Amino acid sequence: MCRWFRRKKQGQPQLTPAPVPNGEDYWNSKYPKTVVVYEGRELPNTGMIAVDVRDFFININDYQLQEVAQKLQGLSDDEKALECLRWVIANITYVADKTEYGLEEFWCYPNELLKTKKGDCDDGAILLANLMLAAGLPYWKVRLTAGAVPEGGHAYVTYYYEDGSRWVALDWCYFPNVDAVKDRPDYKNSPIYLEVWFSWNLKYAFCAGVKGEITLKKVRFL
């Protein structure tokens, strides 16, 4: 039967619109939900600490986040997303974990990065996603994404464009594009973002083909 309509058992056929892939339930169910535990924080004399990646979303009412987010009131979701990206690009300096902490990998929480103002790709991406939620964007439209780019592992934000047509990349350091959201292509069609390893929002994590819990060892992010 054509997927665009369902025929009643009796009477004339009626056309029923197919589900439109632009809502919270659709996107939270499109891929298997996974608990991603990532060894992303290395501490001196302790070694790697495994953390549920969702824990990198903190309280959106955190006063440091709100100092930035309150300036974005009255803007559309797309405008808020872009202004959050521009703020991170303008206020955070890219510094490798090895240089800043003497560690191979150290994912910062947003309030830590707001204190130091220095970090690498994952740190800025985590801060950006938290700023977007603090500014009022729906949680399911904001995903932190970890995957491959031509030079190695990379973390960035993917955002669901307000018109419901595509997910776009918001990247503060590897490809710091400040073009309007409407002018950005679907990130999956980009020659820059080659492969997604896992992604997550405030509530759920996703890893293609994986259900249940998965523990990922340290990956060197840019």
Name these PLM-found stretches:
Residues 1-222:
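A structural boundary/capping signal
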